[in-house]
């Protein structure tokens, strides 16, 4: 029995019975109180009903108490504050969670929220102009783990990478590769400021020189540009794909911005918005304060972004008449929606925080308020190597690449560490700490817990083979898991699916990492307590019945840790 789901269902039934209202009960929450003094679980159902029925919350809470106290798994109910209903669950109901995890594992870990949601999540979308730096890795891991979580709770998810292959930075890439091509032909070159001086483009020039000789130099500009652009973008994308694959990340779709131009999708989108009355000719408001010399006060085509909450309307054309980047964004969102997505998630870096409102406006307009949109910002990673910050600039040619850091510490450490802070908070990535074998290193602490559970089971199998066979046959008495430490761990195990649901609901993958760290901490504490008091050891040869129960507990811990690590794309370690 999933206690959280069972209590929610019983509250819905009680709501229908008491107030003939089931729908509003679906919005009620079941939470774990921060203070254990307030019981095991708490619900706000009384306050929700009270607001709807114009009744005092405590009066509603008392009526719910009368009905719910009769449930077989409820030990007691208390009314707190303005009307919170606090539940204390009977120990045997918590203990039964262990049996669910071990004997009904697939059902316990299965979560089915809403299969009607078709989510498109776009993340990384780094310009294909060079190797990915560690800052990109944070958004990559966040987006990938969020997609995994959403899939885990039964949403249909498309993972997408938007290839920015139509902007000025691509022109700079082409110019740089052309110089490297000339260099490969024997010409002395200088990389001007603003281009890409990194050595990673040298091999591209050499490949072109080998394939074309000096033929590219005899071509006209347009023909040469087209060949170099196609070649360079594909090579850089191959590089990015490999960097991502080495992190355990694979997108379903790589979508080309250039394709929007080539297929006329931008023109089509603009015409649609014109028919909707959302495009007009006007001027942009002057910037606040001192007017910048680059401010463009010409009459131009603008999208009515302010109608949907943006701070200003947005231009869809540049001064030279070409489409703006914003116009591409309009067409791209339309394309996603036409492919069937009814919920768009954008994962952006900290340097794009100003894009949130404009993206929301785009989707609200094109989705006609029927398509959900969420824009998540990943803050900077403060990467330190020997106490010296690493420059993160592809233009300077000196940066901490994903490949470098992956080679240094491995993908599992990168993935886990990127989730040790909420995505909208800056993250310190300490290369020294992530290599330590101590509780100060969170991924080591979690992996060590997994290894220890396997060690416990192996030890029991070796020392007590008959008892181990009984454990595997499900012959254990879970009522023996009655100490405060054991019940606390069991409650945490029972809350695993609740944590997963909350991570999906609030788009917060860090909750999984925090949960695993918490579970590992409680397990290690009990293990260490067993060193001081033999009664708390997991394997006690003189007490077969208690050993059987604790083997069940250890196995449940192992399965939940493995499930959590699997969700975040980290391989559980079986030995160290």
Swiss-Prot record:
Enzyme class: ligase
GO cellular component, one term: cytoplasm
Motif ('HIGH' region): 128-136
Catalysis: reaction(s): tRNA(Arg) + L-arginine + ATP = L-arginyl-tRNA(Arg) + AMP + diphosphate
UniProt-listed InterPro entries: aa-tRNA-synth_I_CS, Arg-tRNA-ligase, Arg-tRNA-synth_N, Arg-tRNA-synth_N_sf, ArgRS_core, DALR_anticod-bd, Rossmann-like_a/b/a_fold, tRNAsynth_Ia_anticodon-bd
Main subcellular location: cytoplasm
Cell location: Cytoplasm
GO function term, MF aspect, one: arginine-tRNA ligase activity
Subunit-structure text: Monomer.
Protein name (database record): Arginine--tRNA ligase
Lineage: Bacteria, Pseudomonadati, Pseudomonadota, Alphaproteobacteria, Rickettsiales
